[in-house]
Structures are given as structure tokens and as C-alpha cells.
Amino acid sequence: MAAFTNTATLTYNNQTRNSNIVTGEILEVLTATKNVIGANYHVGDTLTYVVTVVNSGATAITGLTLSDDLGAYTFGTGTLTPLDYVEDSLRYYTNGTLATTATVTAGPPLTVTGISVPAGGDATIIYQAKVNEFAPLTNESSVKNTATVTGGAQTLTAEATIAVSAEPELTITKTLCPQTVVEDGQITYT
């Protein structure tokens, strides 16, 4: 919640008087949360993100924009983005009903415009991102992904963090050459 103060000044006949200071409080009507489905990642995994914006006010809020940094971080003098938005994966719901009015720009950053949140209701934006080669893979690394919602009275931010998998992602393949062998023949496994 944000607080504000106000003072009145009265000037008459070269005399100035200040009033007492009054303090008010601005109640935040919108809140945002962000979650990632899953506990950890490997390169190539597809992650699902859920951003929910709740309107506790009595008036619908329209024209909101969601911007997702897709986990961008500074590396040297540049910026790397470890997640790629999965094209056409975004679904936008108002009060649980699929809506179609939002416009998506893949980015980075991922940008969703035209979001509306009904009075006393919520908007839920669900989308997928694929982990790419810029995701950190060292032990105890993670991708912190931040969503920002603008267009309301205040800017909202919500974060979701997912850790790299501590288990290696191993695969093994065995081949036999030749596949057909005569008795006392020789074969090679690789």
C-alpha cells in the first residue's frame, strides 16, 4: 500500500500559514502472482508459466500489458535470454473463461497487450517457454523469470524461479553389427 501526504498553505496580507499535514493511504486494487509448473529444468525442456492478475476493486481494469523478460540476465557487456517463448502457446482467461482479445509479441521480452481484469475478478495468462542454450547449467543455478504488468494505477511485478536439475540427463544407445550372425561368427557391440 502506498501512502500520501498533503499540506495546505494560506497566504493573506503578506502572511503565510501552513495547515497540519494529513496522510492518506492508496489501496492497491490489482495484485499479480507468477508460478512455473515443475521443479527443475534441463536444456530443451518446455516450461509452463502461469501469471494471475487479481482485481479486488469495484471497477474493471482494461488495457493492461504483461511483459515477461524470459529470464534475461547480463553476461559480459550483453544480455542473454535463457528462455524462448513457444509460439501460439499463450492462453488468456478472464474469470476462468477463455478470452481472445490479447495480442502477443514473442520478443524477447514476451509482450501481451489488451489484458482486461473484471471487477472483483481475475485474468490468468498461461504460456510456455523452452529452455535454450543460454540457461545456466552449473550446480545450484536457476532461471529467475520476471513478469511486469503495466497500465493500471501501479506497475506490478511477479517472479518465478526454477532450478537446474541436479541429475544429469543421460541417454545410452547400443548397436550390434552385424545383426545376423552365423554360428561361431563374430559380432561387435557399440
Where in this protein do the model-derived segments appear?
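Exported/extracytosolic protein signature
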Residues: 1-190
